């Protein structure tokens, strides 16, 4: 999940209250055989906030008015009252154009805009409105792709010095969070996510040899870290 701070108004006095809306997940899967999925928002703050939600296909700089997506979010903009919640419903309008033999990755954006406090508004204070934008992985999974839990076991690794190619022959996105020898010190410094039926190269802190068996940790649908053993080719 990535967070990006957006600044509104002029920076004269600092009065920011943001990041109070909690989302019920770190990633969202849309099964192809479902009519819709829901995302739960909770506002634990003592004041209401506005929340705007939209999907993008990987361009973090794209604005909602420039994005074409087959998904419909209801409501796209909502007021989330203090100590209350809001349900977002995401429905697929048409699956035309979406791959039927592998997953498609989108990103769910949530922009939280805190309100201006009443006395600040009345006194005409200049206020810094700090809006927090969060992005979550949103994956469309067509029906009939098989068992996602076993996908990481099908990864293959190809070494070239201190570089390692992670080959993903499955129809699923697989997030690799950690690569190590027997669960020891991590060899990778960043998380990678090889797309379905493709490969991605990651730099390692030390070279690995053909025939070695590495521990590969991947993130499952529920955000849990799962380790599998994979031999280097």
Feature-to-residue mapping (PLM):
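Terminal connector regions
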Residues: 94-145, 149, 211-233
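Positively charged n-region of N-terminal signal peptides that target proteins for export
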Residues: 1-4
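Short, basic/aromatic beta-hairpin or loop at an interaction surface
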Residues: 57-67, 176-180
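Intrinsically disordered, low-complexity Pro/Gly/Ser/Thr-rich segments with frequent PxxP/GP/PP motifs
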Residues: 63-96, 184-211
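N-terminal signal peptide c-region/cleavage motif recognized by signal peptidases
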Residues: 13-15
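Short, hydrophobic/aromatic beta-strand segments
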Residues: 47-55, 167, 174-179
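Asparagine-centered strand-capping/turn motif at beta-strand->loop junctions
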Residues: 41-45, 164-170
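Beta-sheet-dominated interaction scaffolds and their linkers
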Residues: 18-42, 147-159, 191
């Amino acid at each position: 999940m990535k967070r990006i701070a957006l600044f509104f108004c002029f920076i004269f006095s600092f009065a920011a209250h943001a990041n109070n809306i909690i989302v019920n997940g770190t990633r969202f899967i849309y099964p192809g055989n479902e009519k819709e999925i829901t995302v739960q928002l909770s506002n634990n703050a003592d004041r209401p906030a506005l929340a705007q939600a939209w999907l993008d296909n990987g361009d973090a700089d794209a604005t909602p008015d420039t994005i074409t997506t087959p998904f419909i979010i209801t409501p796209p903009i909502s007021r989330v009252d203090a100590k209350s919640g809001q349900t977002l419903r995401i429905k697929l309008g048409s699956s035309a154009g979406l791959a039927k033999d592998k997953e498609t990755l989108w990103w769910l954006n949530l922009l939280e805009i805190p309100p201006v406090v009443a006395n600040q508004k009345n006194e005409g204070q200049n206020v810094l409105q700090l809006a927090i934008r969060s992005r979550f992985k949103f994956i469309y999974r067509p029906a009939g792709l098989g068992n996602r839990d076993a996908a990481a076991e099908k990864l293959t690794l190809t070494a070239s010095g201190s570089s390692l190619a992670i080959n993903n022959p499955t129809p699923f996105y697989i997030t690799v969070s950690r690569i190590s020898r027997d669960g020891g010190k991590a060899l990778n410094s960043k998380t990678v996510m090889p797309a379905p039926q493709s490969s991605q190269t990651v730099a390692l802190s030390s070279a690995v040899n053909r025939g070695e068996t590495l521990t590969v940790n991947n993130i499952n649908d529920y955000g849990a870290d799962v380790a599998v053993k994979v031999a280097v080719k």
